[in-house]
Amino acid sequence: GVPSAVSKDKSFIYSSPNLKGLENMDLGHLLKDALGIPAFVDRDVNYLLMNDIKNFDLDPDKDKTILGMYLGTGFGNALYVNGKLFSGKHGVAGELGHIPLMGTKGLCGCGNTECCELKCSGKHLQELREEYFPDTCIDDIFTEHGDDPIIREYIDTLAYPISTEITLFDPDYVVMAGGVMIMKDFPMERLIEQIKQRTRHPYPAEDINFIYPKHTQTSGVIGGALAYFASEK
């Protein structure tokens, strides 16, 4: 799994904002040639979502709509509909971190401007720490500054893209994870409150089922295997 936009045939990496060395690389075929076995490449968050669905038994009947929100260095998003990952025409569906957020300034790693990932990401959290809380370790930023207006605005901004996608898909479950969301004292209650406030009422706002997994280093590996077997059916 890679933090990148990957082709429909699970081989070519189109864009990788946070790992530039992977861009425009046919990684799937390179791995196949090197290993002598078929190799499939996909976004890492797709594999994480497949692992989470299995661990929490979220879709035994293969008829659910499940959204994955993974806040790490960037803002990862995965879509699962009726037993399958949804990838769209070109394989790049679910790039929620790269929808425009009006008023956002700066150039995103993807090459666009106004991408919400410029505000909704672990990278931006680190920028806030460096500018406003330079004496605080990043691991303690929510513990020491969770009630600061700067951090509250950061959390509130996260709610906009998440609530937008929930309103669009009316999902059965929304998985909330990633390195930032599992940080010590992350204000999840406030984030959920803001998401519900901004989601369409009465539904889906009044019936959102959030799931909070804890990942290990093998989560994506297992999810990759699950995704492969699901694609072969």
PLM segments and residue spans:
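Glycine-rich phosphate-binding loop of actin/hexokinase-like ATP-binding domains
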Residues: D63-K119
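General beta-strand structural signal in soluble alpha/beta enzymes
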Residues: A39-D44
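Short, acidic/small-residue loops that bind anionic groups at enzyme active sites
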Residues: N24-L30, G97-L101
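ATP-binding/phosphotransfer module of carbohydrate and carboxylate kinases, centering on a glycine-rich
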Residues: V6-F12, H29-I37, I53-D63, G103-L107, ...
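A charged helix-plus-loop insertion that forms the helical arch/lid used to bind
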Residues: K10-N24
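Short glycine-rich anion-binding loops that position phosphate/pyrophosphate groups of nucleotides
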Residues: P3-A5, G72-G74, V180
